[in-house]
UniProtKB/Swiss-Prot annotation:
Residues 1-19 form the signal peptide. It is found in: Cell outer membrane. InterPro entries: Lysozyme-like_dom_sf, Murein_transglycosylaseC, Murein_transglycosylaseC_N, Transglyc_AS, Transglycosylase_SLT_dom_1. This is Membrane-bound lytic murein transglycosylase C. Belongs to the transglycosylase Slt family. Its main location: membrane. One of its GO terms (cellular component) is cell outer membrane. HAMAP family: MltC. GO terms for molecular function: hydrolase activity, acting on glycosyl bonds; peptidoglycan lytic transglycosylase activity. It comes from the Bacteria. It comes from Glaesserella parasuis serovar 5 (strain SH0165). The keyword 4Fe-4S does not apply. NCBIfam families: PRK11671.1.
């Protein structure tokens, strides 16, 4: 259990540009009535504050586990049972302060949950519905090497885990936790990536963005976790921030306001939004950069830190920055953005996405 990550409580949303940032005011939307996607964008800080207090009261201090970009965390049974999927480490840990039946139920529901996070409240204590098309199918196998795709297999696997893999640990508050650890298969990331290939192919054709770039960004942003949410309220597979990139995207779609969480938790809408934002970076904010490789490096860095921050690495004046970029070869642009960008996160981000993109170069 030492591998468990402890996530700090999010009592307020941190108001700064993170993943999928934007630098300019949005344009006015159409005067025609548009769907209202922004109803549930407020009050998240209150929700998270109450969530944190609930966990502290039941599990004790320093035991808060919270959903993040590459970690799915879901509490059930009035917060006495929880499941944690690390999509980065390829490991599932399901634990309870209640009885074995609660643990069995959580094992089954976790293994058979769907891929669409729309309408799923990760901060409530209810079970995620069982899906006929489980998201983890092909990523987890049972004791016989079978993919867990239905209730019968999941229940049989749960029985095996409870009889052979059950462990306990003691909390600082004196309570005993019972848990099981389920490893994912070695190529679990690749399996998840394949699930989204039809959508990525569709958005690539729609916006003229290379599939490998979309997939590389998805891997680095969320490890293909459709339930992803960051401390800066970036949401979904491509980690779109509603109030920045989301506003830019909606303005260009002719919508007012910004997308809400349910909109961005829909995989199709999220990949559409993230890919559209890449075109905004390419065609608007970074317009004028002539070399396609240099522009790609700038787009990747800007997706994380914002176009303004990228251009200021070269000059405070936008036109002068673009001129300087055009006077340098792509290798120099890469070196500068990975060494001179003031944000260490942005420096590392370009390295990671560029590396991840190479894996998907031959995907069509």
């Amino acid at each position: 259990m030492n591998k468990y990550k402890k996530f700090l409580p999010l009592l307020v949303l941190i108001p700064f540009l993170a993943s999928c940032g934007s630098d300019t005011p949005t344009r006015k939307g159409s005067k025609k009535p548009r769907p209202d996607y922004s109803k549930n964008t407020n009050g998240l800080d209150i929700l998270m504050g109450q969530f944190s207090r609930n966990i502290d009261q039941i599990w004790g201090v320093n035991e808060l586990l919270q959903a993040s970009q590459k970690d799915y965390v879901k509490y059930t049974d009035k917060y006495y049972t929880r499941s944690h999927i690390s999509f980065e480490d390829g490991q599932i840990i399901i634990e309870t302060l209640a009885d074995h039946n609660r643990l069995r139920n959580s094992i089954i529901h976790t293994l058979l949950m769907g891929s669409d996070a729309t309408g799923i409240d990760l901060f409530a204590s209810g079970d995620v519905p069982i899906s006929n098309n489980p998201f983890l199918a092909g990523q987890v196998v049972d004791q016989y090497g079978r993919s867990v795709t239905n209730v019968a297999v999941a229940n049989d696997f749960a029985t095996y885990l409870l009889q052979n893999k059950l462990k306990t640990r003691r909390l600082k508050n004196g309570h005993t936790v019972t848990y099981v650890t389920i490893p994912m298969i070695a190529n679990h990331v690749e399996v998840r990536a394949r699930r989204y290939l039809p959508l990525v192919r569709q958005m690539s054709k729609r916006y003229g963005i290379d599939m490998s770039l979309i997939l590389g960004i998805m891997e680095v942003e969320s490890a293909f976790n459709p339930y992803a949410v960051s401390y800066a309220n970036a949401i979904g597979l491509m980690q779109v921030v509603p109030r920045t990139a989301g506003r830019d995207i909606f303005a260009r779609k002719g919508f007012g306001g910004q997308p809400n969480r349910d909109y961005l938790y829909n995989p199709s809408q999220n990949i559409d939004a993230g890919t559209m934002f890449l075109t905004i970076l390419r065609d608007e904010y970074l317009e004028g950069i002539t070399d396609p490789t240099s522009k790609r490096y700038a787009m990747i860095s800007a997706y994380n830190s914002g176009a303004g921050a990228v251009l200021r690495v070269f000059d405070n004046d936008k036109l002068m920055a673009i001129e300087r970029i055009n006077n340098l070869d792509p290798s120099a642009i890469y070196r500068i953005l990975t060494t001179a960008h003031p944000s260490s996160q942005a420096r590392n981000y370009l390295v990671k996405v560029n590396k991840a993109q190479q894996k998907y170069r031959n995907v069509r």
